[in-house]
Curated annotation (Swiss-Prot):
Its EC number is 2.7.1.30. It comes from Aromatoleum aromaticum (strain DSM 19018 / LMG 30748 / EbN1) (Azoarcus sp. (strain EbN1)). Pathway: Polyol metabolism; glycerol degradation via glycerol kinase pathway; sn-glycerol 3-phosphate from glycerol: step 1/1. Belongs to the FGGY kinase family. The keyword Isomerase does not apply. This is Glycerol kinase. Pfam families: FGGY_C, FGGY_N.
Length: 496
């Protein structure tokens, strides 16, 4: 049994990869699923569609790999984080659509928590800013709006979970209601110092403890799949939120190492070791992973709109036919000619945390063309990352020596060069871009003893290309100053 199955449940698609012990992909499958926007600021997924696409991908990947489920050493799961589900324990049926991490419907509830003076208490316990991004206020909203939900929750009839919990519940035939420490740390309900659910915060939001999953290590066997799902009972031995899994897959095992994932959003995580670093610059202190009871912490900066900006150029503006076309279009001009795009379509994440910022486009002239807007879009992705690195540096977690990158948009050579230029440090792209799924596989493999430890895993990591900064310092500083001026104008655009 030398194969691993990685289930990668993302924001826009479900993926599954079968990997061998060398981290080589033997079979893969991917399916997209529908995004639902029932009201402005709302983003939902169909929980049943999440399951259907993920499990179908798992079976297809095994078939393409020519690997029977009985030959799997373990299953690892990685998932879109913070997305919130509520279901019946008796049937496993979801009571409402999944509220996606991008959803802003609880922004006003977060305002009330801040106005009541709870922000410092929440930050001290969870390491998080009070924001609609996280699960806590989403869950409270479901309990308030699904008829009878709070009473049923108190009676122990309902279960809450992020996507990992939802998948494990159904993989195990309802036998397991668990989440890993990293996913738990994204709920705004988990004390990251004591590594347990915070009773004070549960009481504050009137969330019955009976709803909550058991918190387990990110690496280690927590149970098995039921044979009906995959065709055999397979140990479930790895669970990690997508960004934690990507950090693990990038072998960022030493304090000070960092990776940025360019997906729907962009997520920069820096390993801070066995001790949490409290940010004074509105970054998130989070749990990277927990193995054998030992916790590794990280600083995180979350960008809400990353690759989604390229999708908007394609679907919203019609400037490109395919997402890959943005590189050639942006490369057709030497710079953006002063055009600045602030992609605050759903507000701004770290380090601003402004739910009322909105997307803005500055510096347009009669000479502005599609190529300038495309280039400004790539620059916006890179400049948001610059803001995060600067905040980490101020928090004492830097200076950054190099940035490891992954995610779909990391394949864009122009974006990676722009990123290196604006950061002023090398950007390193690995040979294996599927680092999120790889991280899930690594966590699972470690959990069943496939590797001796993280040192052996680190030796597997290989760079594909290194992008060195070539931009002059004065041009870099001018671009960053122009960007920050634009961000200030975009902030607070809509009324609270």
């Amino acid at each position: 049994m030398s194969y691993l199955l990685a289930l990668d449940q993302g924001t826009t698609s479900s993926r599954a990869l079968v990997l061998d012990r060398d981290g080589q992909v033997k079979g893969a499958a991917q399916q997209t699923f529908a995004q639902h926007y029932p009201q402005p600021g709302w983003v939902e997924h169909d929980p049943a569609e999440i399951l259907a696409t993920q499990f179908d991908c798992a079976r297809t990947a095994l078939e393409r790999a020519g690997v029977a489920a009985s030959a799997l050493a373990a299953v690892g799961i990685t998932n879109q984080r913070e997305t919130t589900l509520l279901w019946e324990r008796s049937t496993g049926r979801a009571l409402a659509p999944a509220i996606v991490w991008q959803d802003r419907r609880t922004a006003a509830a977060c305002d009330r928590l801040r106005e009541a003076g709870h922000a410092d208490t929440i930050r001290a316990s969870t390491g998080l800013e009070v924001d609609a991004y996280f699960s806590a206020t989403k869950l409270a909203w479901l309990l308030d709006h699904v008829p009878g939900a709070r009473a049923r929750a108190r009676a122990g009839e309902l279960a809450f979970g992020t996507v990992d919990s939802w998948l494990v519940w159904h993989l195990s035939g309802g036998a397991l209601h668990v989440t890993d420490a990293g996913n738990a740390s994204r709920t705004m309900l988990f004390n990251i110092h004591r590594c347990e659910w915070d009773e004070t915060l549960l009481a504050l939001l009137d969330i019955p403890p009976a709803l909550l999953p058991r918190v387990v290590d990110s690496s280690g066997v927590c149970g098995t799949t039921c044979a009906e799902v995959l065709g055999a009972a397979v140990p479930i031995a790895g669970i990690g939120g997508d960004q934690q899994a990507a950090t693990f897959g990038q072998a960022c095992f030493a304090p000070g190492m960092a990776k940025n994932t360019y997906g729907t959003g962009c997520f920069l995580l820096m390993n801070t070791g066995a001790a949490p670093v409290t940010s004074t610059n509105r970054l998130l202190t989070t749990i990277g992973w927990r193995s054998r009871g030992e916790t590794c912490y990280a600083l995180e900066g979350s960008i809400f709109i990353g690759g989604a900006l390229v999708q908007w150029l394609r679907d919203g503006l019609g400037l490109i036919r395919r997402a890959e076309d943005v590189e050639a279009l942006a490369a057709s001009v030497p710079d953006s000619e002063g055009v600045v795009l602030v992609p605050a379509f759903t507000g701004l994440g770290a380090p601003y945390w402004d739910a009322y910022a909105r997307g803005t486009l500055f510096g347009l002239t009669r000479g502005t063309g599609a190529a300038h807007i495309a280039r400004a879009a790539l620059e916006a992705i890179a400049l948001q990352t610059v803001d995060l690195v600067a905040a980490m540096d101020r928090d004492g977690a830097g200076p950054l020596a190099e940035l490891r990158v992954d995610g779909g948009a990391a394949a864009n050579d122009l974006l990676m060069q722009i990123q290196a230029d604006l950061l002023g440090v090398p950007v390193v792209r690995p040979k294996m871009l599927e680092t999120t799924a790889l991280g899930a596989a690594y966590l699972a493999g470690l959990g069943v003893g496939m590797w001796s430890g993280i040192e052996e895993l680190a030796s597997h990591w290989r760079a594909e290309r290194r992008f060195e900064p070539v931009m002059a310092e004065d041009r870099r500083e001018a671009a960053i100053a122009r960007w920050r001026r634009a961000v200030e104008r975009a902030r607070g655009w809509v009324a609270a």
